[in-house]
Amino acid sequence: MSTLSVTAAPAHPRQARWTFLLHRWALVVWVTLVVAISGLLLWAAGPLADDSDRAWHQLEACRRLSRCVVDTGSYAATYEFLTYALILLPFVVAAWAGATLTARELESGTALMAWTQGVSPVRWLAVRLTLPAVVLTVGASLLVALHRFAWEAPEERTGDRPTWWLPFTFHANGPTTVAACLTALAVGTLTGLLVRRTLPALGVSVAASVLLLGGAHWLMPHLRTPVTEVGPFREGYPGLYTGVELSHGLVTRTGAHIPTPECRATSMDDCLRIYEQHGGTGFYTTFHPASHYWPLQLTTTALLLVVTALLTAASFVVLRRRTG
């Protein structure tokens, strides 16, 4: 007598296909966003930057005229719009992850159906985290690289480009945006598991992401030792508006750093007398110069990835406790 044995198909590929089918429209929207923003960034770095270059040369040539009107093109407006788009991406991810990635399946019973068909809750969650994480990392990394390419258009072509330390430009030009998307994914996933209702999970996910990412930005300048420069009154605040500033003020005779006293006088000499009455001998500025850009980016990215790992671990703990 011969015995026939039937081997069940692996659950993991089946779950991956099911996840793809369930969230295919989200994938279509994400790919469309990435392609559209990528095209606009390339347009800004090429034709728009060239138009701005021609306009700035015209402005340089007609400076001797009493009146000079030059159209500088759409580079600045387009760049600003695309920078805002990149900054908003993590919050869009949080809204989607909170509303549909876990909460909708728990609310509709789709998750329970999968668990009764031989798919463990842990594997179910692992697939739903892994596939979006890969897609988000690839797409966000491409957008960050193209944004930096558009920003690095030579200054003589585009006029005054946004300085590197402006908050939105700082994050859109580096890996913190990619890490923020992953953090938002983890926030939405955990929120969906806790709330289990689509619309409330959406709102809570976005609010929690705002708090977490805002907190990371606030901590960012404190993750590395800043530089302090001191100079005489006549030279103004040294290093001001050249980097990420933490503080500026007066240097006293004892070497202490104090806030600059308020001065409403119309002349600098009058203000200097007020400063000297407070024991001031010069100005100081504590800031992060351009050489600190990548250390700040990498430490902030590492912080966000640690938070992402903790949120992901918390998601598995919550799921295990609720499913026994």
Description of each model-found segment:
Residues M1-V35, V317:
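Aromatic- and glycine-rich beta-strand/loop motifs that create alpha-glucan
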Residues V6, V35-L42, G73, E80-T83, ...:
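Secretory targeting signals
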Residues W25-C62, A85-A95, V204-A216:
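Hydrophobic alpha-helical transmembrane segments of multi-pass membrane transport/permease proteins
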Residues V204-A265:
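Aromatic-rich transmembrane-lumenal/periplasmic boundary elements in polytopic membrane proteins
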Residues A97-Q117:
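Transmembrane helix boundary and interhelical loop/hinge segments in multi-pass membrane proteins
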Residues S2-V6, C271-Q277, P295-G324:
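Junction motif at the cytosolic side of a transmembrane helix
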Residues H23-W30, L86-L89, P121-R148:
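Selective transmembrane-helix segments that form parts of the transport pathway or gating/packing helices
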Residues D50-G98, F287-L303:
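Membrane-embedded or membrane-proximal helical elements that form or frame transporter/channel pores
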